[in-house]
């Protein structure tokens, strides 16, 4: 195959469950089989973990929008950001973050919430392009995801006090 796109999930990479371990092993396999992997949010967490590097629960989170993502010098020279504004906002929904890049990994962009908003690394002849945010999701869809997850966001995550905080 030429490529694989690995999208988001409501799972958290730092939870050590059989389902998560299976996904990490699955990613390790694909990191040997394809030329390119676009790893979005959860996909980036799985790709970095499969490459043997650290991630953790973020100190804060993105709920709806990742603001002021800033492309760094490495990112400006990377094809992922060709023609993109240096600072931008994007739909985002995450509680995890990469704390150590894979070997020869390059951070391409960051913001106040996540030092690694995007990255690039190669492993086993596979090029991995990782994004912590969700360019594939519209803002309208993000609003519906927040609505769908509101009980969890209030009762478990405690990022909102009540439903009025969400509106």
PLM feature spans:
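Short, Asp-centered acidic motifs that coordinate Mg2+ and/or phosphate
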Residues: 3
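Glycine-rich, N-terminal phosphate-binding loop of Rossmann-like dinucleotide-binding domains
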Residues: 8
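Amide-donor transfer/coupling interface in amidating biosynthetic enzymes
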Residues: 71-167
